[in-house]
């Protein structure tokens, strides 16, 4: 238990931030999982590209806002684009 007022405030702040981070990371994971699922199901190319665009936008937003390190976001985007490109060429992963 915190002994000082400032430590109590830090606990409150970290709980709030942790909850916010969890929401954003869960949404990001859901979008990435959607893209991978569509690729596995061999869905329409247009549908995969729309899901891919949404995932990339979310990753970019998370990097700008500081929820995710920019290199981490870049790495995730790179892996996702490699999957999508392979899918669009006809080599379903």
Swiss-Prot record:
Biased composition annotated in UniProt, kind: Basic and acidic residues: 1-11
Gene3D superfamilies the UniProt entry points to: Ribosomal protein S20
Keywords: Ribonucleoprotein, Ribosomal protein, RNA-binding, rRNA-binding
Basic residues biased stretches: 12-23
BP GO annotations: translation
Signal peptide region: none
Superkingdom of the source species: Bacteria
Spans annotated as Disordered: 1-23
Cellular component aspect of the GO annotation: cytosol; small ribosomal subunit
Keyword Ribosomal protein set for record: yes
GO molecular function per UniProt: small ribosomal subunit rRNA binding; structural constituent of ribosome
Cited PANTHER family: 30S RIBOSOMAL PROTEIN S20, SMALL RIBOSOMAL SUBUNIT PROTEIN BS20C
Family: Belongs to the bacterial ribosomal protein bS20 family.
Stored HAMAP family: Ribosomal_bS20
Primary role: Binds directly to 16S ribosomal RNA.
Name of the featured protein: Small ribosomal subunit protein bS20
Gene: rpsT
């Amino acid at each position: 238990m915190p002994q000082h007022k400032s430590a109590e405030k830090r606990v409150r702040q970290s709980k709030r931030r942790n909850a916010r981070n969890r929401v954003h990371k869960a949404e990001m994971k859901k979008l990435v999982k959607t893209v991978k699922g569509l690729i596995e199901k061999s869905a329409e190319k247009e549908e995969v590209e729309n899901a891919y665009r949404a995932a990339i936008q979310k990753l970019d937003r998370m990097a700008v806002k500081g929820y995710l390190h920019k290199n981490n976001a870049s790495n995730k985007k790179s892996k996702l684009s490699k999957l999508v490109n392979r899918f669009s060429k006809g080599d379903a992963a």
